[in-house]
């Protein structure tokens, strides 16, 4: 079964259909890396650095809200129509490690997934080339210092 986002996994579990093979939130080595990274158009980032940093700040503050107040975040998701059921939204927010963005190394995450994609034959470039040509950690590093909790 492919990756499923809420509410499908909860519905399947409630009906006792299938079983979890890999839970990237808890199973090593996957759990030691970010599941998602934010991407931006290089030209936009270059010409609009203030807006870029604001977007990233908003995403990181939203992650903090999900980590510290999953009940409030789940209610907002349901009230805004992004999630149909509060209990499923709350369960998802409570199970995912939203608070790890300060601890995990984004560059290490890129390296890890680039290696996996290369091993599987999906990409030809090595991790170092992808990191050198396609990443810019300045905004994240600045916000890690700025948003220390």
Regions found by a protein language model. Give the residues of each.
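Generic secondary-structure boundary/loop-capping signal
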Residues: 30, 35, 42, 90, ...
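Secondary-structure end/capping motifs
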Residues: 46-125
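A local structural micro-motif
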Residues: 2, 20, 85, 125-126
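Pocket-lining segment of extracytoplasmic ligand-binding domains
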Residues: 1-79
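Short secondary-structure capping/turn micro-motifs that flank functional sites
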Residues: 10, 28-29, 83, 93, ...
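Residue-level "edge-of-site" marker
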Residues: 7, 25, 90, 130-131
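Conserved C-terminal helix/tail region of periplasmic/extracytoplasmic solute-binding proteins
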Residues: 117-149
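Short, structured secondary-structure boundary patches
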Residues: 23-27, 40-45, 107-110, 142-149
